[in-house]
UniProtKB/Swiss-Prot annotation:
The gene is VPS72. This is Vacuolar protein sorting-associated protein 72. SMART domains: YL1_C. GO terms for molecular function: histone binding. Present with 358 molecules/cell in log phase SD medium. The modification Phosphoserine is found at S425. GO terms for biological process: chromatin remodeling; regulation of DNA-templated transcription. It comes from Saccharomyces cerevisiae (strain ATCC 204508 / S288c) (Baker's yeast). Residues 57-92, 119-133 have a biased composition (Acidic residues). Keywords: Chromatin regulator, Coiled coil, Nucleus, Phosphoprotein. The keyword Nucleus applies. Residues 1-281 are annotated as: Interaction with HTZ1. InterPro entries: Vps72/YL1_C, YL1_N. Residues 134-143, 337-354 have a biased composition (Basic and acidic residues).
Amino acid sequence: MSDEGADKSLDTNTEFIIQTRSRRSNAGNKLQKLLEQELRDIESTKRQISSYKNGNDDEEDEIGLLFQEDEDDEDFEMMAKDDDDEGEEKEDETQSIRKEPSQASSEQAADDLMFSSSESEDSSNENDEDAEEKEIRRQELLSRKKRNKRLQKGPVVIKKQKPKPKSGEAIPRSHHTHEQLNAETLLLNTRRTSKRSSVMENTMKVYEKLSKAEKKRKIIQERIRKHKEQESQHMLTQEERLRIAKETEKLNILSLDKFKEQEVWKKENRLALQKRQKQKFQPNETILQFLSTAWLMTPAMELEDRKYWQEQLNKRDKKKKKYPRKPKKNLNLGKQDASDDKKRESEESIKNDGDVNSLGENSSSVHNQKRIEETSTNDTVEGESSPDAAVSRVNSDELKPTALPDVTLDAIANKQSTVDEAPNSQPQKNIITNEQKITNVGEPIQNLHNEEIKDEMVSALESRENTFENSSPAAQVVSQRDNSATPTPSNSTGTEDTILISPDTDIKGEPEPCLKTEGIENLSHNVPQETKSNTDVSFLKQVTFTDHPQVAIIDTEESPSKKDTANVDESSAENSLSTQTYEGPEQLTSRNFVTLYDFPNAPPNLKDFNTNLFGDRWSYTNGLSATQRPQDMKTVFHSILPSPPQSSVPSPTVDISLDLSALANFPSFGEYDKKIVHQINTEINKDLEIKIKTQPPTGVFLANGIRKKCLITNKECQYFDPRTGVPYSDVEAYKIIQRIQDPISKEEGRSDIKRDETTNEDSDDQVRFKWFGFKNGGIYLDLSQRPAKGVPEGF
């Protein structure tokens, strides 16, 4: 209670500023203006409604046009803002009054009433002063409202009435005329444009486009005009159409001719281009062509191929050797010459005895049985291998006490002696007769000076030669060569009869009408092969005059060159009489051909082979010595053909046997339980160290490029085991992985050996790592590591 009494005493005793302050001149003006404006708006709306009803719109429009103001009137906008601010302040004041507490004192309420009454008195005085201004503003507001309404309605459109056309006149059609954009209008000075560089650039581009479009438009219009003129022309007659057709035909022919010429020109160019692309070499350019092909070879083809190339090499060697060396004499030939000297002495003594006893012999016994036989292949081979023991085959029923010796003459030796020793001027009769030797073993030799026997022998030989010539053309060639190279048979002395026949032949008797020519035909097949090797070949004949088996001893005192040719003839005879057949399956082999020729098809020049192969400087540098050659020249390679070892008698056989020892291990036919055992010896060397220098494989890296960690050493992996795929870092880790993979060891099953009782001797044999499994996995423990202190055994 004391507080309320104190407040009342303060209110009565104190004086407030609001009571003592003088009143403002414009107090309450804003609220009054708002009220008046609201009244004016209501009145204006009523007038507009009445005016619309009465139809006074035209007059009001004319008044509005007279008092039309600009839309951007800054003064009016400022006044409108002030009015809005006053309205907002009034609303704020009314809201503040409502929020005041109802328990205000009666004195404060009385003061407020006094303040409001004073404001009303001041406002009445000010209204009289501003009456004229308010009237002006009211009129302005009215004019603006009218103008806004007119704008909202839009302008009034008045349509013009069209004159009605008369009944007789035609109604003209209306054509819409479009104004074409002209490029020149863009460059007019009166046109308002910007002076910016970008704007000027764009205008120039538009100007160019419009100018081009205008040119095209003119061209199109000109075409349309011509087309319309053509349509408007009169119809053509038949003569005019024929004339136009002829003209068009000429034009078409010319165009077709031109088209043909173009096609021919294109074809020629295309062919020339293809030819230029194909022709990679210049004319007369040396080309070395390599060709590898598949080839089916048989053993016979291999032998023929080897024989052909052997002959080619022999020909080349003969061309290279200007002065061929004579081959060395064999010791066997020397011994044979010594034996021949002894035989020659015995023959001379026998001949002397035969001259004395020949008169008392009966020559008619010679004519009892006469026969000419051709020796078989086995007899000829034996006669060639052992000429001192050549025995003629005669039946025992035909033997008689009188006998004549077997006469054998070596024609090839005589023929080659004429080539090697006898000059062209020397007669060949003496050479032939000196080489012929007649011997007898165990029987006396009679003198053959009777003319009848000699004529019969010559006729037999001539008939046999004729049959051989008629048998085959190859034999005719050989016989002609023999006849040209050897002289006709003649007597060198009064006592000796000389007959020219082939080697290893026996004269047995008169010729029969039918002669066997098997051996001759066999010899004729080998004639081309022997001509390739540049050796003379003669056919074999054997003639005998005896009834008893005789032995013909051949004395060949010849030079070493003759003996070599004789050996070649013997080998060829062996080949012809007993040919060895080689059989075998065909083998697919590869054959490489190297061809050197001049482009396009000129034959190669074999003389300048090295020049074509190594260049033009080859001949120049080849003629110079090693000191005169330029320093920048280097030897590329040495081409040397190894010479095969030359044997005295070339063997026709070739060893083609294969090593089939590997087939012994396989089971043969009928063996089902045989097993192949491979023996593998392994040696362990612990002193060597493994040094890995290869690059790490891709399996060492993860997907992000980081190396994997080694499971043993926890280092970065360098390699991984290809068998298991386990990565490792070094060799020690790899060894540990190998030990873990070893499942069996000598000491694995022994439980009596404790961990501490292991020694160094058996440490290698024991298991170092042992697997200890758990519920969800396990671990390999190193048994060699000592556990920590206090760990129980077996933990």
